[in-house]
Amino acid sequence: MRTTAFFAFMALLSAGCGGTAQKSPSGNIRAEVFAGKEGLYYTVTHDGRTVIDTSALGITIDDTELFRDAALRPAGTRKIDETYSVTGRKAVSEGRCNEYLFDVTHRPSGYKYRLQTRLYDDGFAYRFVLPGDGTRTVNGEAAQWRPPHQSRVWFAERNSGWKLLTYAGEWISTTADSLHIVSRQGPVQTMPLLYRTPDEYVMIAEAALYDYSGMRLRAEPGASLRADFTEQEGFELSGDIVTPWRVTIIARDLDALVNTDIITSLNPAPDPELFADTSWIVPGRSLWSWWSGIDGGFMTLEGEKRVIDTAASLGIEYSTVDDGWEERPDKWKFLHELAGYAQSRGVGLFVWRHWEKLNDPADDYRQMRGFLDSVAAVGIKGVKVDFMNGEGIRQIDFNTHLLKNAARRRLLVNPHGCQKPTGEIRTYPNEITREGVRGIELNRITANYEKRMRDEGRTPDPDRYVPGDENQNIPASHNAALPFTRGVLGAADYTPVAFTMPGGTTAAHQLAFALLLDSPLLTIAENPFVLSGDERYRPALDIIRRLPTVWDETVVLPQSEIGRLAVIARRKGGTWYIAGVNTAPAAVTIPAGLIPATARKAQIVRDAADG
């Protein structure tokens, strides 16, 4: 990983900074933080327009609202100008911002802590640093956002209790003023939320979620948002408390939104000792037997070896051994033989595990370390850990320990059934992707439901939408929204390419979507034997054989529209790939200058006239 950085520090004098006024390097983003009668507040503007109207910020610890009756004093500033590499959408990322420091004193107790803000040319972020010893309880935060009323907001909806657990909602939109009443699951929404104002795109998110509980957003009347946490009564932390960054991304267009580096730049650089050598972090594609069942050969030694053979013949780097291997009485013998066979064929293996079988924190997660030792010993390259189902402090601590312990054993990690990414891929580059997205497995679940209904002589209910019986194929509108919503935050293991179960989409749509989300580990859902043997998909297979999973450059074409049309161009070396998905016919023009004039050959894949 290459990282270069330049930091300039200087004292911030009240007479020279205009009080608490702050600005980004170009001056287009400006913010102000101030202490009012009831607490601490901030505002954010973009090119002179109010983006976040006066909103509260603050934290409550041990039932003390440290933001009330607080004094705020400027303490310093620095300019940050760094470049670094994060595996994914482009070769070089940048962290260029102005950081402002404020000392905060809670007058009734005399307790002193710090507020940090950072202003980028495409956003604003803040966090608190609270020194202390022993165990304290974070009861909540006063964090608030008040975006413009005249906005449309995109959010992830799932009409079941799973909505706030797995981040697997369908992306839809409503007016900002109705967000608090639109969902039958209540006013609490998952991050991110994306607002389309008359002049820009505004995304609310968080970054650097470590040693803390993940934040959700409670929508309120008047288009306001408030912080919400899994632990309604609070969560305990020891020692100094550092909150995640509370982030507002501000983008002039969808290309700027998709290419923002704010989330990763707010995360620490990788540990130079833990990641001194990163040659073992190898992105690539993976075949996967779970989605299709591989014609009855699922979790048989012969069937999984055939998947490995198919991967080798197609030049695909990995195969994923999913849920089911542990049910075999000879599970470790099975895994050992399969891993050895995969190694002989030049294919790496990922292996699945339920998180509850790893989550005992006793003896510094001895249970976890033992499992990782075992899979590393037989030659496994990565682990897919599933069903964390939440973002409370318990899940977040587990995830961090998993990434650290896996890195010590040179193992890649693919978290599933998990929360949104917050930039972990920079600090722990062995996180090769993560779920936290509504992906194509829903088409499989729907097919299972419909088959069960038919077998029982019943008609599938089109409105059925509960865990285990979700009759909800992924619609094209969801896919046309994902790159500009959940996809902005980081890699998403959507597991694309479902030719045989496309729902209401087409084969070309399924192939195109494989290029639209970042995922350095690109797990392909389709039956490996259909993929390699069905002549109908031969043109698609030609693309899949050489499809990169990391890119040098990503460009969103200007005709793109959230939920209707997503067209993205990506470059790897001297080759450009352009893919699009849509919900209705649309004309797309490739901007002049995007493709070099010297380009001499293009391959076009589209749906046949008969579908």
Language-model-derived ranges and their functions:
Residues 499-572:
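Glycine-rich, aromatic-lined ligand/substrate-binding cores of catalytic
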Residues 128, 311, 386, 413, ...:
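Conserved, mostly hydrophobic/aromatic
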Residues 21-269:
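N-terminal accessory beta-strand-rich subdomains and adjacent acidic, glycine-rich linkers
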Residues 561-598:
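Carbohydrate-binding surface patches
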Residues 324-506:
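Aromatic- and carboxylate-enriched substrate-binding clefts and catalytic-loop regions
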Residues 238-318:
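An acidic-aromatic substrate-binding cleft motif
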Residues 4-14:
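Sec-dependent N-terminal signal peptides
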Residues 12-23:
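Bacterial Sec-dependent signal peptides at the C-terminal "C-region" and cleavage site
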